[in-house]
Design a protein with these regions (language model features):
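N-terminal signal peptide c-region/cleavage motif recognized by signal peptidases
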Residues: 26-28
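N-terminal amphipathic/hydrophobic interface segments
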Residues: 30-156
Length: 156
């Protein structure tokens, strides 16, 4: 068996893998892609609802909205429904209202505000009133109004 000199340089495959990893890390964190495919569920201690298309439901006491890894909690909520009785929008208030979601990388986003207005169609949550959001690896933001895109994890 012949011995050959070994190079200290990483192989081309290793260099490409490192480059690819670096490019992936430069991309913005994306919210769970499969969350949007999950049904939106809301629970509470009590509720009052209309029996008409394009109606609404008022929830009271320990309100919890979930859709995949997305979770919104609060004391009170109003859910707006379309003609098929699917949830299109939920406004949650609490002391404070809380939102959290895990992105595809496993990073947790958490936020609190006096009110969270979640648009299930546009996948946007607007936190209003002493709003605070923390995203692992991306820092935190505070303000009177913060907008969080649950599809892209972008905060404005």
């Amino acid at each position: 068996m012949m011995s050959t000199a070994r190079s200290c340089l990483p192989s081309r495959a290793v260099r490409l893998a490192i480059l690819g990893l670096g490019l992936v890390m430069l991309q913005p964190a994306l919210a769970r892609k499969d969350d949007r495919q999950q049904p939106a569920n809301i629970s509470a201690k009590s509720f009052d609802a209309t029996q008409q298309a394009n109606g609404f439901v008022h929830y009271k006491g320990s309100v919890v909205l979930t859709q995949g890894t997305l979770k919104v909690t609060g004391a009170l909520a109003t859910a707006y429904l379309d003609a098929d009785n699917s949830v299109t929008r939920v406004v949650v208030t609490g002391s404070p209202a809380h939102i959290e979601q895990v992105d595809d990388s496993g990073n947790l986003m958490q936020g609190n505000a006096a009110s969270i207005d979640y648009d299930n169609v546009k996948q946007i949550a607007v936190l209003t009133g002493n709003a605070w959001v923390k995203q692992k690896g991306r820092g935190e933001a505070r303000g009177d109004k913060l907008t969080y895109n649950t599809q892209t994890s972008q905060m404005t």
